[in-house]
Amino acid sequence: MTPEENDLLCRVENGAPMGKLMRQHWVPACLSEEVAEADGTPIRIRALGDNLVAFRDSKGRLGVLDENCPHRRASLVLARNEECGLRCLYHGWKFDVDGNCLDMASEPPGTQMNDKIKARSYPAREAGGFVWVYMGDPATMPAFEPPAFAPTPDCRVSTLKIHIECNWAQVLEGQIDSAHSSSLHSSDMVPANVDAAKATDTTWLRPSTDKAPRMQCENTSYGFRYAAIRKPIHNADTHDYIRTTVYVAPFTCCLLYTSPSPRD
């Protein structure tokens, strides 16, 4: 891959083609629990190369705006979240969840200049414990439908958010690649005499010592899925241990583990 091809794949900011593609999708931007409190502290979001601010107003409505105030570019992460809007700490301009300028504390009483000012806002929805934002052209915005893999209220889930210094393609490649786990993660994915993949307090047990899985891949309407087929510790002549990886375009990966199963 040339440096130019690498940039074409990995860059998402400043109008890059891949960024334009991703902006046609609803993007998970933060956890709902990070903005759970009405009039709580705003949080910064870094999404597709842009800095945004998320907050929940006095009525519980969720807002996602460009981080910088349209007046003097002060950070709205430092704003006061009060009375149904973010009030910029610099000059007191106040914006609601739709980006409307509700008040200009630094302007003369009765001014109507605020009718001409608007902060850029982004449609936001909540589902599965996440805040999802749409950052593309409003004219082509798809209806929001929680993805099939998103947790539902009756699910017991543990959600972990990690900041990784890499581009989106690097981390996705690592998630999709099943073969590396036997070597790179050998200290925390331990072969063991168990019936199926099983988590403990410190390790992840799996019933296989096979470091060279066979791959079977299937293209789908949403991306692709493939099976990494390993020999299990027991019944290796008649059974397989399978880890299924599901890729959902453009940037989601789901891992599914199964018990050793008889071969058809």
Regions found by a protein language model. Name each.
Residues 1-51:
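Zn-dependent metallo-beta-lactamase
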Residues 11, 22, 117, 164-168:
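A structural signal for well-ordered alpha-helical scaffolds and beta->alpha junctions
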Residues 20-22, 47, 117, 126, ...:
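A generic structural signal for short, non-catalytic loop/turn and secondary-structure boundary residues
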Residues 26, 99, 179-180:
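Secondary-structure boundary/capping signal
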Residues 30-157, 214, 234-246, 251-253:
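Rieske [2Fe-2S] iron-sulfur-binding domain
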Residues 61, 138-259:
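C-terminal catalytic domain of Rieske-type non-heme iron oxygenases
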Residues 260-264:
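A short, hydrophobic C-terminal helix/tail in secreted or cell-surface proteins
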